[in-house]
Amino acid sequence: MQSHSGNETTPLSQRLTLLLLTENQPDFLRRALKYYSSYPCNVIVVDASPAPDAQVAERAGLQYIHNAALSETGLSARIAEGLKQVSTPFVVYAQVDSFLLPDALTEAVSFLESNERYGTCQGYSLGYQAYVDHVDYFRRDRKVHEDYASDQADERLLSFMGQSVSLLNAVTRTGLARQWFTSVPEGTERHWQEIGHMAFLVAAAALRILPIPYALHVNAGKEAEHRYGAAIAGAVKHIDPKAKAERETLARLVVSSLGNSRDLQGEQGEHAVLAGLAAMAECLETQPYQGGEKIISSAWNVALTQADAQFEPRQFVELPFYNQPLFDELAQIEFLIHLLPAGQVQMEGLESVLVKQAELLRVQSNPDAESLLSRLWQAYAHYSFSHSVVQRLADELGKSEDEDDIERAERIVAWGQRLQSDSAFDNSQLLRGMPSGKLLDWLDARDPAPAQLKKLTTQLTRRPAGSQIGILLLDLDADVFKLQATFDSLINSHYRAFKVVVFTTGGLPATTSLNDTLHFVKVTESNYVDKINQVVKQASSDWLMLAQAGEEFTRSGLLLASAELIDAGQCRAVAVDEIHRQANGTLAPLFRPGFNLDLLQSVPTLAARHWLIRRELLVEAGGYSREFPKALEFDLLLRLIEQGGMSGLAHLSEPVLIC
């Protein structure tokens, strides 16, 4: 290779332009701009979102192109739009959810500057998927022949296309990039754009794959990756007339885009391109277009404030990913990923942990609740990238005179400073814009104002008859933590007239009676239904609700329900609304309609739980049936309907539980 490099003193911003492509990805865009902020190349953002991003448009040192019409176009048209503004000799393009490694870009530029015969250069890439607490990495590229330097374009085509390597994110001479992307007809399918791009670049000039880590590209998921890989493979492998015609069309496009190439012209050139596609088809007979095997899972170690990589059993050591400089770079990327979250998968996980943090840090009225410091440590362990959590933990530790706490406070303060240096935004505020956060804000807004709260409390004190609510709390797993969560929610609520009977398989913490606000009854799996029915007969509460340990009561739900029950003499049973804690930890409302027998029978797990049952009617109905231990409430409601029809079955539009 001949070296003609003379650009060592020319600023990188005059040598390389990075085109960042985005559409409705503001979080990814901000993260990408932060990642590349210290890399001194020229940056152009091409934004196809419906509305421009004013904050990004005003950033210094950045060219921002907003064109909403590009949303109706393909990849090539978007890149072509950005290329209009490129004045550097080299260009590279990436989606905003990718990370092109700066050192690799610089090395690729240096290689092309030193070797004029080469038009394109890149290294090897990984796939990644970010979660709230870890990042998974996937093999994407395979080890391939790395130098395609033949003087004959047809030889380069045959050799490179037989390797099936994407070049969409390679550093390319700007002239070649314009030559291709301005030639691609609108409406060309994405997979044909990628295949054509590969064929054009290797036909136009020599090509180099450097043995270095080059980029991270977000993993689209197994199904999406499989569909796209199948489209690529089908395009070059299928033998039906339509597929054959599409290949011939692409061959003509590649040859025409090359212009006056002396190597590939006319039918001879088209045959060379088709031969390259055939070589690609042969390659894809035995392997997928891109790999998808998970090779590393890197969890963020809260204690050490760094990434902790765990390797999968199968590795690909022939690839250049096993070196300390790369892992140092990945650690910096992971820090950014967690500090500036983006993408559906990560944001869904973040919503869950932010809900948990909000619950841990709410004001506690229960003197037996966990200490604030203990709850702050738990919140920090769930997600250590919330400024407010870090600050509150540091403040609380700072109050201690214990030497260990003082040392911990210093570490937490240093961590907070590191967060602040890269982003001043408090990620805990993201909850306000998420479904769970909006639901929690809505619940808070339903709290009675102080004057109304005083009025309701006075009203219930003066007219207690007929409105007192008792909770039958099942603790069949003897889980003290779940019990504590339920107790905390009751004590934090505005309702004070409740009585709770806990039916537990665990040891009794104290000797209590039904006259106490909190009464414990020892039960077994075989007799708890009978024990419940005994308590129902003796209880003094007017209304009873069956609940499970761990379910939490909203702050004002029981109070507002009790106030409604004062004048509900005609009601036999009342359904209430609920907030459901979903499997992923997020919250969703369950707003029940008025009583509907069809709904009750079709989805009893949703429609039959947490009814307020008038105690004397529960006794008259014979209590709960031990024949249906998994459907106690559903069976009871059906018997109440058999005895008295559907009259007196009501619904209260008030969320009473989070369950």
Role assignments for model-derived ranges:
Residues V91, L544:
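Short aromatic/hydrophobic "clamp" motif used to bind/position activated sugar donors
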Residues L126-D133, L168, S183, A204-P241, ...:
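Active-site donor/metal-binding and catalytic loop motifs
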Residues M1-S13, E282, Q287-I469, L474-F481, ...:
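Non-catalytic membrane-proximal stalk/linker segments that position and tether the catalytic domains
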Residues R140-G162, T586-R609:
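Short, flexible, basic/aromatic active-site loop/helix in glycosyltransferases
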Residues A69-Q85, V523-A539:
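Glycine-rich, basic loop-to-helix element that forms the pyrophosphate-binding segment
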Residues L176-W180, G187-P211, L617, E627-G648, ...:
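A short, conserved alpha-helix in the catalytic core of glycosyltransferases
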Residues K34-N42, D488-A497:
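Short, acidic, metal-binding catalytic loop of nucleotide-sugar glycosyltransferases
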